[in-house]
Design a protein with these regions (language model features):
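Extreme N-terminal signal-anchor transmembrane helix of membrane signaling/transducer proteins, especially
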Residues: 1-29, 33
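Generic structural "secondary-structure junction" signal
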Residues: 6, 72-75, 168
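Structured catalytic/translocation cores of nucleotide/phosphate-coupled proteins
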Residues: 19-24, 31, 35-36, 105, ...
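Extracytoplasmic/periplasmic sensory segments of membrane signal-transduction proteins
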Residues: 37-47, 52-140
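Extracytoplasmic/periplasmic ligand-binding sensor regions of membrane-associated signaling proteins
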Residues: 94-97, 106-192
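Glycine-centered, small-residue-biased loops immediately flanking beta-strands
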Residues: 199
Length: 200
């Protein structure tokens, strides 16, 4: 009788162990699938946001590069920069993610919304990669890698830029416009999505 009770007790233990193991495997698989699904959704959301955000910025840059006042200033050395600067300042004020705007003309004139950038020489800017890439892409908007920019409001700030060549009616180069976006704006949104915090 004691052996029978012992066998029965062992059988119950094995049964509980088997059920527990199956439950653990099932639960673990479900949790893993849920986590992977959440991570994929976060990646998709991030990708869609960045794509639509950059599309909007590229459209803004295109509008600026084709603006009549910008073209006229770039063509005419005697033209007043006030109209162009007012236009660029308005763009900066209406989009909190934009930190500065710059126009460098082919003949070496510089208009910028930030006074610290205004103190730089246009010849130095013409030698920088963002200027050269804009020329190379023939009036198409170009996204530049993140870099540090010295601004009046901050000692240094990480920015991502959209640049575009300014051309006349015949497609001849007149200069390059650049819009600087605070990198922390993109980073803050991606952090808000909590990508990776629930992933593997």
């Amino acid at each position: 009788l004691i052996q029978l009770v012992l066998y029965f007790f062992l059988f119950i233990l094995l049964l509980f162990g088997l059920i527990g193991s199956l439950y653990y495997q099932t639960s673990s698989g479900t949790i893993r699938q849920q986590t992977e699904r959440t991570t994929r959704n976060s990646i998709d959301q991030s990708s869609q946001f960045i794509t639509s955000y950059l599309k909007k910025l590229k459209q803004t840059t295109t509008v600026l590069s084709k603006d009549q006042a910008v073209r006229q200033f770039a063509q005419d050395r005697s033209a007043d920069q006030e109209t162009v600067q007012h236009l660029m300042r308005t763009m900066i004020e209406t989009d909190p993610d934009l930190v500065s705007a710059v126009l460098v003309t082919k003949d070496g004139r510089l208009v910028a919304t930030d006074t610290k950038i205004s103190m730089q020489t246009s010849s130095d800017m013409m030698n920088e990669s963002w200027y050269q890439e804009a020329i190379k892409e023939r009036a198409m908007p170009v996204l530049t890698p993140a870099r540090k920019e010295s601004l009046t409001s901050e000692k240094e700030k990480w920015v991502v830029s959209i640049t575009q060549e300014v051309v006349d009616q015949t497609g001849q180069n007149l200069g390059v416009v650049r819009l600087d976006i605070g990198y922390d704006s993109l980073q803050a949104y991606l952090d808000h999505l909590q990508l990776g915090k629930q992933g593997f």
